[in-house]
């Protein structure tokens, strides 16, 4: 297995997705993804579209999950890459990555998954998930910010985006951030050691919150599948109250809440709309 440190989340996505696309352009120009991917993934794909790559954006359904059958139907002779996130950062749904990965292997198509949200929260095993490439970010497991990692299956080659001294086996040249890498490694160790205990605790709390909110609040709805979801992410919508009023009420009770992600506008995000 090859592992490579990175400079952060956006850098990881660009290196893997752009690197694979440019490497395989002679074999095909079609990429399959979903409508609920992280903006850094979607913007990378939009850039590739300016280079004459074709991208299919698969929908999700009411449960927030991509159908494997839709992936299968989207494959063409020109398909070189499938990239579907493992867990969604907005609504928390988990995608059928192992099944999609199996399909990709059968069709000899490279498969990338964004495991940034799931790593440290649920078991992430590249062999069980059938992935060729996988993205991670340090800050999601309480490690140093601005540090990421990518898994590249042995034998898979990508085109480097930064040239120079040939560090990281030529995948990314430039002086390596040793303190960041060490800190990320320690954060991974701690997260892995406490994984089962934290998972059980979070699932119990998550399910209690879901049950109590749906029972107590009129016209409240859970977004995404009830069971196939991250242990630490819940997304509700309320038809009986205006969002900002709810935020003020929760703040008065000592709860931190928001109607949007930190780096977005108050408008609904693609994942929720999908």
Language-model segments: residues:
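Helix C-cap/helix->beta junction micro-motif
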Residues: 51-52, 106-107, 253
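Active-site PLP attachment segment
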Residues: 129-186
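A C-terminal functional module that forms or caps the active site or interfaces directly
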Residues: 252, 259-265
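Conserved PLP-anchoring active-site segment centered on the Schiff-base-forming lysine
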Residues: 19-42, 54-59
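Conserved PLP-dependent catalytic core of the aminotransferase class-I/II
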Residues: 193-246, 252
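Single conserved hydrophobic/aromatic residue that forms the stacking wall/gate
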Residues: 1-9, 13, 263-274
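Active-site phosphate-binding strand-loop segment of PLP-dependent enzymes
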Residues: 56, 60-120
């Amino acid at each position: 297995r090859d592992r490579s440190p990175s400079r952060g989340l956006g850098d990881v996505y660009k290196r893997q997705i752009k690197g694979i696309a440019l490497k395989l352009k002679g074999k095909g120009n079609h990429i399959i993804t979903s409508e609920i991917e992280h903006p850094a993934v979607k913007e990378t794909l939009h850039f590739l579209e300016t280079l004459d790559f074709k991208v299919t954006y698969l929908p999700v359904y009411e449960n927030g999950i991509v159908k494997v059958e839709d992936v299968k139907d989207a494959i063409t002779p020109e398909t070189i890459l499938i990239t579907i996130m493992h867990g969604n950062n907005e609504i928390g749904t988990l995608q059928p990555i192992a099944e999609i990965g199996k399909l990709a292997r059968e069709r000899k198509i490279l498969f990338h998954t964004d495991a940034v949200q799931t790593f440290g929260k649920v078991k992430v095993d590249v062999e069980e998930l059938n992935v060729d490439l996988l993205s991670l970010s340090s800050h999601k497991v309480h490690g140093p910010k601005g540090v990421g990692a990518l898994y590249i299956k042995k034998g898979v080659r990508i085109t480097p985006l930064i040239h120079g001294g040939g560090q990281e086996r030529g995948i990314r040249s430039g002086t390596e951030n040793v303190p960041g890498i060490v800190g990320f490694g320690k954060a991974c160790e701690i997260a892995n050691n406490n994984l089962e205990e934290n998972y059980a605790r979070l699932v119990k709390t998550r399910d209690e919150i879901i049950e109590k909110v749906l029972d107590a609040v009129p016209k409240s709805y859970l977004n995404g599948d009830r069971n196939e979801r991250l242990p630490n992410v819940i997304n509700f919508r309320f038809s009986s109250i205006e969002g900002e009023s709810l935020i003020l009420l929760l703040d008065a009770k000592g709860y931190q809440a928001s109607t949007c992600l930190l780096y977005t506008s108050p408008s609904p995000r693609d994942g929720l709309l999908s």
